[in-house]
Amino acid sequence: EGADIVLLSILGIAALPAFEYCLKNGIPVALASKEAMVCGGAVARKLMDDTRTPVLPVDSELSAIFQCLRGNDINDVERILLTASGGPFRSFALEQMKDITKEMALKHPTWTMGQKITIDSATMMNKGLEIMETRWLFDIHASKITVVVHPESVVHSAVEYKDGAVMAQLGAPDMRLPIEYA
């Protein structure tokens, strides 16, 4: 109680009770736990719609989408371009994949992260989770979300509108920027 904003970074489905509490009590959430959206899905979306409590994504790609949508109507969106670095194996031939080690997977070419998210990123599992998170956080059908491999990680994501305009958020690959924005 009395919080101006809560940074939610609880892993797994355990994030849902705190997410629900914050929203029902009008406490804005800086969402660093994609699990609240992935596990919560339609329930989390309904809470957001019912309470109208602000949810600000901390993840760089989701923060970029949030920024590109500011002042615009989600119904005007043609598609969301969700970027991915492609991870450390993006240029590997299929034959090379059998020799991948955990140590190799933990050497992300762009970001410095914890072990779980680094492995999830190396296998593109993290991008699958981000597709689900994007779907529920922005209330947009998954068919309107396109993953684009962008190894430089300068374009954090973009939104293409039905009128042909594309808005993108660009910046250095530095997590301090989306954290500060939230």
Predicted regions and their residues:
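Catalytic, metal-anchored helix/loop core of enzyme active sites in primary metabolism
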Residues: 1-182
